[in-house]
Each structure stands twice: as structure tokens, then as C-alpha cells.
């Protein structure tokens, strides 16, 4: 499917006010607007009701504190921008960064909320010693938290391991303070024991009428505000996980909001009382979702709305117009996981603020006026790391209490550096006060301990060293954390070919991860490539020695091998093609055709290209894995290339697969050969070659 250049955007057709800007959520242009603090930026992310809302310019906490004081101050008048339609064609664009970061303004609706708290919610606005929301955020003792923070910073954790009947390996860890129990929690079979807002009880049960075994294992930690790394996400359980996390995120936002409003009303009623109400952070946003595509964002929003069931959704049409697209029908033959990830709008540049009121969800709210932020890593980093240092801002992340990173394996194929950047800027002390009422801020925020109270949940189809680094570095929850990984049967046992294929694994020595690329290249050129070149150059029938596909996971390794083929005397007489995620489409087609026809004896092929395109390469007679794929599904897909030409499938099966690995590939190797085999292959001293048929 052809993708638009840049980050598409324009106005939707139902705009009725000049108060809208022409910029939407999702733009990659240079951000040129005025400084977000010094001047009132042009308002993009607003709906028609914003004329009532944008009056005071005071941040959320101060707003709620002063509502009953009947403040009449007016903020600066908003600039007006003409709405332009470009031939009626709609694009999806991001607003200038300042529009997303505009400071919050007052709302008549919020004032009504001080008076109008649902009767059914009265009872669950009080602190409850059995509610994890209260025990985790409000009732924790300072000494307990400080001891846990110190133990975590000293890397002192105690753990418990267990394998479930469904084949899930669980490892739970808590900071080792000399107290506490790291035992695994009992599975959660339904929502009857979950402390949800009463208005969510019915929708939650409807969303997830029956939990799967894996969901039952994870739910106690999710609703108990512990960190979770779930490494068994797949197309079968992704929808249930998404609904489960949406229920948790919505519940957290509603409890936070209603507690603040109730305490605010109490302050108004007891003005002479010396109340110590610690119920807020520095800024309003409390939940951060990091997602791979706009369509993934729409699916999360759909789960949230089915859970919250708002009477009104502001800017919903704009959301659907700019974030959602129908699936590409030409992809019906693509693998299921590919269709799930890239189906619909696969733009990976977006950000969206969600604001909740009692009966309404507003989309495209400014970040400082939002309860939830949903964004791609690229979209969020763009707003945080602007070229103009004065316009950089991450204070809106200072009070995030729940982080949900969904489909992390897809984010890995984008740019993991953006994830690291965002996580490193979470829960930092804000550089500006933003009108914060510090008398209402929780003490652990003031003590700079928020990162140890924050909950982080990451779901992924498989776990990589990058994700393990997040688990050890950023998952520092004082309540503990859990990692869940499947027991792997091994991708080698699931190759979709009608005949047996010889699959050989060659181990090479590598002293450190940093030296691994050099050791791999040396082993490849001296052992694998020398044998391959010898067969190609010594054979009289050139057509019989062609068809070698070299699969290379890393783009840096791809460049190194490609340059070696192009310049080395070793490969002077070897014709080859090379295609990667950066290769022009026309050049890709030419290289694949030459390879299929035998004009190229060798084709270099990267993992990221396969991730984004899922090509079926014809003409493959043997496969060399320079390194094993991160995604175990790719193993079967690539090995199946050997069977695409029915006439030569037996010959191709004899050519087989040869894969290189070192001890630093343990996680990949486990997914390919299986959990039971990986240990012996890494430790075996009697040889370094392992063959499976």
C-alpha cells in the first residue's frame, strides 16, 4: 500500500468554528509557532465547546482548587486561524507542538462537576484499605517507600519463579528490604474482586466475560499496580489484553479525577479547617499509552469508550477521519500478525490527548488538560525534543502514574531509541510550576520518588535485550514486578514445507556483546562465505549453484556484508543483489527478478524489510541466516521460501538452512530451537554444529 509522505492532515468537514486551527494531530513539519509558555498558542486541539473552556489559562490542579472561589480572571484571547480546504482532500497532520502543549483553561463543565458527583460514586471516592489505588498511591508509608527505593537502586530484589499449566513462565520480583513476600498472587478469574469504579463494573464484565488462563495470571498484578512485562502477546490474546488494560487505565483516571473533585468540594465546604489533602501530581496527565500505529490508537480508544460508555464524544468524527482507514484488501494473503499491525492506518507519527468529564470524552485535548496521552514514540519525541531548546517540554510527563507500552515488538522495528528517550524523561521534576498547588501534591512526588510508584506495563510478542533492559532499569515499582514468557516448542518444528528440511546451527565464539559483530563477520567470511564462493566458482552449471538467500537481521551488518560482496577479492566472481528497508521499490523488484532468474547467485535480505513487506522470495535453493530473526514467526516464513517452486522443492530442502549464533543470541535461539534444546546448544563442549531435520 502506498503511504503518504509526511504526516497527513487537514481539517474534517464538520468544522463550524474559526477557532479551529488547520493543523491536526500527526504533522512532521517544522514547529514554528510561538513559545508555548510566553504566548497563547493557536488552538488546534479543541472542539466547539472550547469557547467556554478556554478562559483562565490556569493549570489543572490550581483550577480545581479555585473553582469554588468564583474566579473571574480571563486568559488572553485566542488567535483565530482560517480553515483551509485543499480541494476537499483530507490529510492527517500533527499540530504544531505548542498546540498540544497549551496550558489548560477552565471549563464550566468542570465547575458543574464540583457540585454534581454521581450518587453511585460517592462510596468509592473514600479511601479504602482494600483498594490498590489507595494502598499503592495514598497509604504507603514514607519509610516503606524509601527502603524499597534504596533496595531497587542497589539492585537488591528477591524473586519467585513458576511455570503455569498453560506453559507460561512467571518470575515475580520485589525489592529486597528484608520484609515482604515475593510469592505469586492467585489468578484473577473475574472482576468480582477488582475494585473498579461502580460505573465500570457492568461494562468490564461485558468486555471480558471470561478471562483466558494468561489473562487470569496477569490481572492481579495489573490491577495491583505492579510492573508487568508480558512476553507472550499474539493475535489471539491481543484484543483481550487491550480491553483489560483499557479497563485498568480508565478506572485509574476516573478514581483520580473523582477523588480530586470530592476533595475540592470538601475544601470549599470546610474553608476554616486545616485539611491536608494529598491527592494530585504536578500536572494533570496520569496515563501514557505508547502504540505503534494510528489504527492501534483507534482500537485502544474503542476499548476505552466501550468501558467508559460516555454520553458524548467530542471530536469523534475528526478522530475517525484522521486516525482510521479500512484494511487493504490486497493483504488478505499476508500473515495474520502483519494484518493486525499494518491493517488500517499504519502511520507511526501521531499523538492524542484524551480528557474525561463525568459524561464525556474529549479527543484532541491539549496535553496539560488531558487525563490520558496516546502516542507513537516518534510522535511523542517530536514534541519533546524540538530543535529550538526553548520549546522543548516534558513536564506533561512528570505525573504519569500508569505507562502502557503495547505491541513493543512492533515498536522495536521502528526506532527503540525513541522509547529510551521517553522513558528517561518520565516522572522528572517539572522545570516550571504550571500553576501547581503544591499543598495538594503527594509527598512522594515532592521527594522525587514517582518513578518508584509509577506502574509500567509492556506487552510484546517476544522479549529482547532492549526490553529486558527496560525491565531492569525502568521497572522500579516498590510494589514489585513480574515477567511472563512462554515455554517455546521451537520454530524449527513448525516449518510449513511438505518435505523435511535440513536446519543447521553453527556456533561461534564471542567474548562480549560489543565484539559480537566483528566475531560474526569473521566467522561468516572465513567459514560460510568461503565455502559458498568455492561452490559457485567451481561449478560448471552456474544455474545449479545460484539461489542463496542470506538473511541479515541488523542493518549495520547488512551494510558491512554488502560492502564486502561489492569490494572484496573473495567475491569478485559472485553476482549478488541486496535489498533492505531503505532500498527503492523499483530496485527491489529488479533485484528479486534477477535472483529468481539466476542472474544473481546471492540475495542479501534484511529482517526489517521482511517485517514491513513480508515478501515471498522466489528462486531460493538454500538459506544462510547471518543471524537469527528476533521474531520466531519469520523463521518459518523465510524457510518456506524453499518450497515456493514446487519443481525444485526437494532440491531446495536438501540445500536447507544454515544459521549462525553465539551465546549472546540465547533469547533468539530459544524461540527458534525451543526451550528444552537451547541450554545444551549454548553449553555443548563437544562441538559447535547442531543439525535438525
Curated annotation (Swiss-Prot):
It comes from the Eukaryota. It is found in: Nucleus, Nucleolus. Residues 1-133 are annotated as: Disordered. Residues 84-93 have a biased composition (Basic and acidic residues). Residues 15-54, 97-131 have a biased composition (Acidic residues). Its main location: nucleus. GO terms for biological process: maturation of SSU-rRNA from tricistronic rRNA transcript (SSU-rRNA, 5.8S rRNA, LSU-rRNA). Keywords: Nucleus, Ribonucleoprotein, Ribosome biogenesis, rRNA processing. One of its GO terms (cellular component) is small-subunit processome. Pfam families: Utp25_C (PF06862), UTP25_NTPase-like (PF22916). Gene3D superfamilies: P-loop containing nucleotide triphosphate hydrolases. One of its GO terms (molecular function) is rRNA binding. DEAD-box RNA helicase-like protein required for pre-18S rRNA processing, specifically at sites A0, A1, and A2. Component of the ribosomal small subunit (SSU) processome composed of at least 40 protein subunits and snoRNA U3. Belongs to the UTP25 family. This is U3 small nucleolar RNA-associated protein 25. It comes from Aspergillus clavatus (strain ATCC 1007 / CBS 513.65 / DSM 816 / NCTC 3887 / NRRL 1 / QM 1276 / 107). The lineage of its organism: Eukaryota, Fungi, Dikarya, Ascomycota, Pezizomycotina. The gene is utp25.
